[in-house]
């Protein structure tokens, strides 16, 4: 290659947005023929896994935000003189911010790319944690929580979509489940660190995931499908080549993606009346339905009440018990990550929903029977233990399917030309019902503990029906093949 050719290619690189192209993988593509690619670069699974591990810092931030308010409640209310209602507002503001972030997430990811979207999400997260760390009153505390929620709302849509768009079909399920696995790791870390460090230091530690994410984004390729949709053909093929390995023939996959993009751009403008067509309404219904049912199954209500259940069973340290539940979530989600490309999405969703239904029936029955048993009797103690078993089982079954898979399926089945709008709607619905369950849990539990868990159990039973009748199996299919299923 001549010096002039090198200069020309360098000038072309400078014209392109750095956040979209990165630098190392273009250099690797040019030099691989001269130097020979290393096994690490040549192996597509390693390349894709490295990208997934970097963007997984986003969901870790997501989980850390969710878990932060639990171990810090006593210290924050004491140091800042907050009432219980003021702290409840603090806890719920992340959901409010996430709803706003969810509304914007799809359009941001469509206009500036998946990587640019994650960059935007990281900045308010960092500012939010700093606001909380230096808060002297509720104003900075609330502002920080809102900013965190906004960033998390964008992350919750963008990360599963990015992973689905870069992963090969035989690894997409497992890699897609890393999203929820990272969320549970973030929650567990917040619980664990909250046992040992003050709340202000814990907020400073919350900055780390996004602080590492920002530079990491410059070392991974942009989603090839987004680049293809935007007409950036050279970058699209370079990105895909890096993800599949420099010595892999990507001709077939390139042609499939080009055909899919060409087909979708013919119908680039989608009106609400067009959503009546099966190719749009069916995947939209499935994506929104699963994300709504994920929340209506009551996981947030169960986790919210878990410390009280543990105390009634004689567990002395509710914070330690909460950390134990967080650790169980991580293990169960890791098992799901390993199984999802082997067993399939539908089977895991069905097992998860059936298991959650049975677990919630056990918890509800324990609470109903407690009303007829003396608190001093052995039977009352056994019923308390039974309720703990039911809660733990519910968390395990949720983590096996209904935790990770709705996000995975949403990212897989939404058509390219409505993914931004439809993904925003689905993410907004998930966050809205998360907020609704959190806000109503206390009221429902005050009305009837047994009745509350019965309602959650009925929703989980309906989820079994929903999965059986309407959720398609996406295992082993390319994203382009999935689009053709709905035509």
Curated annotation (Swiss-Prot):
It is a multi-pass membrane protein. This is Sugar transporter ERD6-like 6. The chain crosses the membrane at residues 46-66, 89-109, 115-135, 146-166, 178-198, 201-221, 284-304, 320-340, 347-367, 389-409, 425-445, 451-471. GO terms for cellular component: Golgi apparatus; mitochondrion; plant-type vacuole; plant-type vacuole membrane. Sugar transporter. GO terms for molecular function: sugar transmembrane transporter activity. It holds the Pfam family Sugar_tr. The modification N-acetylserine is found at residue 2. One of its GO terms (biological process) is positive regulation of seed germination. It comes from the Eukaryota. It is found in: Membrane. Belongs to the major facilitator superfamily. Sugar transporter (TC 2.A.1.1) family. Disulfide bonds: none annotated. Gene3D superfamilies: MFS general substrate transporter like domains. Keywords: Acetylation, Membrane, Sugar transport, Transmembrane, Transmembrane helix, Transport. InterPro entries: MFS_dom (IPR020846), MFS_ERD6/Tret1-like (IPR044775), MFS_sugar_transport-like (IPR005828), MFS_trans_sf (IPR036259), MFS_Trehalose_Transporter (IPR050549), Sugar/inositol_transpt (IPR003663), Sugar_transporter_CS (IPR005829). The keyword Heme does not apply.
